[in-house]
From Swiss-Prot:
It is an enzyme of class 2 (transferase). The gene is rsmG. This is Ribosomal RNA small subunit methyltransferase G. InterPro entries: rRNA_ssu_MeTfrase_G, SAM-dependent_MTases_sf. It holds the Pfam family GidB. The keyword S-adenosyl-L-methionine applies. Its EC number is 2.1.1.170. It comes from Allorhizobium ampelinum (strain ATCC BAA-846 / DSM 112012 / S4) (Agrobacterium vitis (strain S4)). GO terms for cellular component: cytosol. The lineage of its organism: Bacteria, Pseudomonadati, Pseudomonadota, Alphaproteobacteria, Hyphomicrobiales.
Amino acid sequence: MSASLFQRLTGLRVSRETYEKLDHFVDLFGKWSKVINLVANSTKDQIWHRHVIDSAQLFKLRPNPQHWIDLGSGGGFPGVITAILLSEKSDGWVDLVESNNKKAAFLRTALMETGARGRVHPVRIEEAHKSLSDCDTISARALADLDLLFSYASPWAEKNKNLNFLLHKGRDYQSEVNNARDRWTFDLIIHPSVLEADSVILEVSGLARSK
């Protein structure tokens, strides 16, 4: 993918150096994905569109995070992509939570070789709050339904009432929202995906347990 097409699809202007880091990550991903399962096989040939662009669109919504936590980082989407985009800035950090040791090893390599602003934590998601401090942004992609995600994230939400979530969801997102409202109160902004007509980014804030 060309740098100009990346900019057109995401609305993000990045330096040549940052684009080269993204390109290097894609090459690295290709090598590692031959050995370990990082994403569904059906999407490996569409890495830029299905994964890089899909992840980068979050940064347009939250361009100046101080402490971003990506839950279930897997193949690095959106965690590594966000950390690479943050490398243009003087502050901001991404903590990537991934309990699978092989995937965690890939993520560490990706962060190191791209000079991205992030760190990998090979712990279970439900235990991550014990070692990770307050954050202002949480992301998760293809991880769990909203109710379970909110349960995972509630320790951070209790500490920071201004916590924001950026969550990729598919066509059935509304049923997840409705189910989550049985146990949680929250504000919601729905952003259409830049790639998929039936996919959205849910921007959630003000999360609290229903009384």
